[in-house]
Amino acid sequence: MTPKTKLPQHKSGEFRTKNSRGNNQVKAEPASPPRIIGGDLKGRRLAFWPGGPTRPMKDRVREMTFDLLGTAVRGATVVNLFAGTGALGFEALSRGARRAIFAERHFPTADYLRRSSRELGLVDRVDIIPGDVLLWSRRMPPLSTESPWIIFVSPPWKFFHTRLA
């Protein structure tokens, strides 16, 4: 039996880097409001709480993800678990997804998802499920078989840290 490895603790808005001597350092990087990078809503910003617990996925990572998915997004139903800013789901809607389901356990962040859906004019294509994401995913209603599904799971760092500690 192997002992559990103690993972380094990260604070919101920080990441680890190595300096020229190979020592780990924590460097704060300010989070900026996420924007949609492709599709019909390209350039539009999402509602974002800069002091909140959410750290948006980098534009470049999202761009590579959607480059890999290509046209598979068109007409799909997207499920965005641990939605945070909803950047993945809103990006998919901008690129032609039929609808998006956002599950977010942090209630104030879920309110920001509602705000983004209103500001982007997507209220009729979005369902927001606030509460325990894992519990909801176990009881998730059956998804329609009329369209393909794409499921994004992007939990916060603290989620893994608390599960492995």
Residue ranges and their predicted role:
Residues 1-165:
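Class I S-adenosyl-L-methionine-dependent methyltransferase catalytic core
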